[in-house]
């Protein structure tokens, strides 16, 4: 994904520079190249893993709190640790 973003930026800047140098509005070859560089599958993260599966895996995983020792679901761990550390200070 990051490679595609970089390619899109390079092609865009190259097209802008070429248009200004030639005083033209558009270069069809570069437009075609930019169209071919579009992401084919937007449901994947930068490592090529499916986003919907990752959310389910992390939310169902349990973590143990080092402060109180309880096991907390991954989706609620940040909220728990915030309250748990706040209680310890009082």
Swiss-Prot record:
Superkingdom assignment: Eukaryota
UniProt GO MF annotations: transcription coactivator activity; zinc ion binding
Disulphide connectivity of cysteines: none
Pfam families, alphabetized: Sgf11
Keywords recorded for this protein, A-Z: Activator, Chromatin regulator, Metal-binding, Nucleus, Transcription, Transcription regulation, Zinc, Zinc-finger
InterPro entries assigned: SAGA_su_Sgf11 (IPR013246)
Zinc finger (SGF11-type): 63-84
Subcellular location per the Swiss-Prot or TrEMBL entry: Nucleus
Keyword presence, Zinc-finger: yes
GO biological process: chromatin organization
GO CC entries: DUBm complex; SAGA complex
Function, as annotated: Functions as a component of the transcription regulatory histone acetylation (HAT) complex SAGA. At the promoters, SAGA is required for recruitment of the basal transcription machinery. It influences RNA polymerase II transcriptional activity through different activities such as TBP interaction and promoter selectivity, interaction with transcription activators, and chromatin modification through histone acetylation and deubiquitination. SAGA acetylates nucleosomal histone H3 to some extent (to form H3K9ac, H3K14ac, H3K18ac and H3K23ac).
Family that this chain belongs to: Belongs to the SGF11 family.
Subunit note: Component of the 1.8 MDa SAGA transcription coactivator-HAT complex. SAGA is built of 5 distinct domains with specialized functions. Within the SAGA complex, SUS1, SGF11, SGF73 and UBP8 form an additional subcomplex of SAGA called the DUB module (deubiquitination module). Interacts directly with SGF73, SUS1 and UBP8.
Domain comment, as recorded: The long N-terminal helix forms part of the 'assembly lobe' of the SAGA deubiquitination module. The C-terminal SGF11-type zinc-finger domain together with the C-terminal catalytic domain of UBP8 forms the 'catalytic lobe' of the SAGA deubiquitination module.
Protein name: SAGA-associated factor 11
Naturally occurring in which organism (per UniProt): Lodderomyces elongisporus (strain ATCC 11503 / CBS 2605 / JCM 1781 / NBRC 1676 / NRRL YB-4239)
């Amino acid at each position: 994904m990051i490679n595609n973003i970089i390619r899109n930026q390079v092609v865009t800047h190259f097209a802008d520079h070429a248009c200004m140098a030639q005083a033209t509005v558009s270069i069809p070859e570069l437009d075609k190249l930019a169209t071919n560089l579009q992401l084919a599958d937007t449901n994947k993260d930068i490592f090529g893993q499916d986003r919907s599966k990752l959310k389910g895996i992390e939310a169902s995983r349990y973590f143990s709190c080092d402060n109180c020792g309880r096991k907390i679901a991954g989706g609620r761990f940040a909220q728990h640790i915030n309250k748990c550390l706040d209680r310890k200070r009082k």
